[in-house]
Regions:
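An acidic, low-aromatic, low-complexity terminal/linker signal
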Residues: 1-151
């Protein structure tokens, strides 16, 4: 398993590399009226409209500065960019190196984290991006899919 490690609000988080389509420099976005507060806006880097999500806002932290990177994923044929501060590198943990969650995580992260990777004297929280996208854009899933994902 390969994990893209990135920094957000001074903490280290991860996303499976197989979910990442590309990483691009931050670009200004156009706000979307009446959208989820985590939706930073939309932008169009190559004639494709992409929804930008500010992970800091989603995790109840301060808004990410208008700099950094977009980690672009494709979820159910919807391009989604996650605004992060910086990419730190690729981790290659073994399955047994990903610890299950316990009470050390805050409530906001515990329900959307797949586990914690310990390496180089720091912890990287492996986020569940399927759950994050489903919570922000619930209309992408059927009722049954949403219930199964949130269990």
């Amino acid at each position: 398993m390969e994990i893209l490690e990135f920094k957000l609000g001074g903490n280290s988080f991860g996303i499976p590399v197989d979910m990442v389509r590309e990483i691009i420099p931050y670009q200004a976005t156009t706000p979307v009226p009446n959208s989820n507060p985590s939706v930073e806006g939309i932008f169009m880097p190559r004639d494709v409209i992409i929804t930008a999500i500010d992970l800091s806002v989603y995790l109840n932290r301060d808004k990410t500065a208008e700099e950094g990177l977009f980690v672009i994923t494709n979820y159910r044929n919807l391009d989604v960019a996650f605004h992060v501060e910086e990419a730190l590198g690729i981790l290659r943990p073994e399955e047994n190196e990903i610890a299950s969650l316990d009470n050390t995580l805050g409530v906001d992260e515990a329900h959307i984290a797949k586990g914690v990777i310990r390496h180089d004297d720091r912890l990287t929280i492996l986020l569940d991006f399927d759950k994050i996208i489903a919570q922000i854009q619930p209309d992408l899933l059927s009722k049954e899919e949403m219930e199964a994902l949130l269990q």
